[in-house]
Amino acid sequence: MKTLLIAMMLLALSHAAVGDDHASKLTLEKRQADSVMTVTNVDLGDEVTTISAKGKMGIYGTVYVTYNLTYNADRASGFVTGQGRGAVDKGTVAAGAFRGIWTREGSIVKIRQMVQISDGSQNMDIIDIDMLKDTFVIKAYKVR
């Protein structure tokens, strides 16, 4: 019985050690100011919907992006993949590839994605597309 009591106490204490409040230690630094994008095309499909957009994106210049959204069974969420190109200056074009998840809440499509950029940097993007408007904002945070 004494062994069982000690084992239960150790189990309870180990939970406190593992359950440290990590959320309060996670901080994300913005890569740049939020960027407004304009939707240029939406192609609705049975298995994939493709959304294309363009806009000015700080250090990446004029950016063109394409999001490919696949559906889960609920048709209100799924995975997203895509590509982006940014004309930084006359001789430099940055390329990015991204993967993530999307959900739809009413008329808002929420995308959360990781981006690998050709210069070696990585971003976590938070995007909320309002389907009632032709614009949306990309919030880019540094990962690497």
Label for each model-derived stretch:
Residues 1-5:
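Positively charged n-region of N-terminal signal peptides that target proteins for export
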Residues 6-7, 17:
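Cleavable N-terminal signal peptides
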Residues 18-144:
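Beta-strand-enriched cores of mature, soluble protein domains
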